[in-house]
């Protein structure tokens, strides 16, 4: 071991942030950077939609700070939508507290050119809170990650039969348009989920983790879709991916019945633990999940500047 300390790493400034094209090598480098951050922080810096859009035509802007070895030490993924810019930022754990995050956030603000900016901080990292405060971004939204034992969650729900007149089936390609329509109704006020298109659904169906048997549909006697429970199992980890109910059938026990049916599927497959994500201000959904013994595991925070 050397008796001499390593030389200090020069603090980058905004001039070192480069807007890069989404070549396969660039996308790979950003994803590997995200993996390093996830291993250190315990949470992924990019959400699923960002990962799906990376490298696509007309995808998000990619802003990168390169290290001396050519690998990115920081990156921002900034997507422009109707409400302005929405971004996610990641910094290599070994290069934090050296100005990389501030340089990237300044570059995102410049990219926005005065339009509203939203930045997600997955895991509510203290560094992200400090950076938001220093740049005038307000805490605008919280997304809770909840976790439960499959057995405890199922016990907590108790007997939850499907409401009369409804029957369960598994997803097929013929169900796609009905699912998109009901998802839009069930999540009409949700800024991301409610905007899912048929193309977005097709992208997820094409993912290696997708299993049609884990997308449960509840239909009435006339074939109308009343609700659904979509489960995701990847790498041995189960997730309540999305659970939706027709607003006309809200508060009638369908959500509880769908959750119970999904948990039964997970138990039959020998899965012990399940996660889910829910908006912190969604009181009805939180009440259901608390009854099912879900507990807080992490929180994602969206900071915003109007």
Curated annotation (Swiss-Prot):
GO aspect biological process, one term: mycothiol biosynthetic process
Catalysed reaction, written as an equation: 1D-myo-inositol 2-(L-cysteinylamino)-2-deoxy-alpha-D-glucopyranoside + acetyl-CoA = mycothiol + CoA + H(+)
UniProt GO molecular function: mycothiol synthase activity; protein-N-terminal-alanine acetyltransferase activity
Cleaved signal peptide residues: none
InterPro entries xref list: Acyl_CoA_acyltransferase (IPR016181), GNAT_dom (IPR000182), MshD_Acetyltransferase (IPR050276), Mycothiol_AcTrfase (IPR017813)
Keywords from the named record: Acyltransferase, Repeat, Transferase
EC number: 2.3.1.189
UniProt KW Transferase keyword: yes
Enzyme class, UniProt record, top EC level: transferase
Transmembrane segments: none
Annotated residues for binding of acetyl-CoA 2: 243-245, 250-256
Domain N-acetyltransferase: 17-163, 166-306
Annotated 1D-myo-inositol 2-(L-cysteinylamino)-2-deoxy-alpha-D-glucopyranoside binding sites: 48, 192, 232, 239, 277
Summary of the function given for this chain in its UniProt record: Catalyzes the transfer of acetyl from acetyl-CoA to desacetylmycothiol (Cys-GlcN-Ins) to form mycothiol.
Similarity-based family: Belongs to the acetyltransferase family. MshD subfamily.
Subunit structure: Monomer.
Record's protein name: Mycothiol acetyltransferase
Organism name: Clavibacter michiganensis subsp. michiganensis (strain NCPPB 382)
Upper lineage: Bacteria, Bacillati, Actinomycetota, Actinomycetes, Micrococcales
């Amino acid at each position: 071991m050397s008796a001499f300390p390593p030389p200090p790493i020069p603090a980058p400034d905004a001039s070192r942030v480069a807007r890069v094209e989404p070549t396969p090598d660039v996308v790979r480098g950003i994803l590997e950077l995200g993996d390093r951050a996830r291993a250190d922080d315990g949470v992924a810096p990019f959400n699923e939609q960002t990962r799906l859009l990376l490298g696509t035509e007309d995808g998000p802007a990619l802003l990168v700070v390169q290290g001396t070895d050519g690998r990115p030490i920081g990156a921002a993924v900034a997507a422009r939508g109707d409400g302005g810019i929405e971004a996610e930022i990641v910094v290599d754990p070994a290069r934090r507290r050296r100005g990389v995050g501030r340089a990237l956030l300044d570059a995102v603000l410049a990219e926005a050119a005065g339009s509203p900016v939203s930045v997600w901080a997955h895991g509510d990292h203290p560094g992200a809170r400090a950076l938001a405060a220093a740049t005038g971004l307000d805490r605008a939204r919280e997304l809770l990650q909840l976790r439960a034992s499959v057995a405890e969650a199922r016990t907590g729900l108790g007997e939850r039969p499907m409401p009369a007149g409804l029957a369960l089936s598994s997803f097929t390609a013929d169900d796609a348009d009905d699912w998109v329509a009901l998802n839009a109704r069930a999540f009409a006020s949700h800024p991301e989920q409610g905007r899912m298109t048929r193309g977005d659904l097709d992208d997820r169906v094409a993912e290696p983790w997708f299993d049609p048997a884990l997308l449960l549909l509840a239909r009435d006697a006339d074939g109308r879709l009343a609700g659904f429970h979509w489960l995701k199992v990847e790498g041995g980890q189960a997730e309540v991916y999305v659970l939706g109910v027709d607003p006309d059938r809200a508060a009638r026990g369908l959500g509880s019945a769908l959750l119970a049916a999904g948990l039964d599927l997970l138990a039959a497959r020998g899965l012990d633990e399940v996660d889910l994500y829910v908006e912190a201000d969604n009181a009805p959904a939180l009440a259901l999940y608390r009854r099912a013994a879900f507990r807080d595991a992490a929180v994602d925070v969206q900071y915003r500047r109007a």
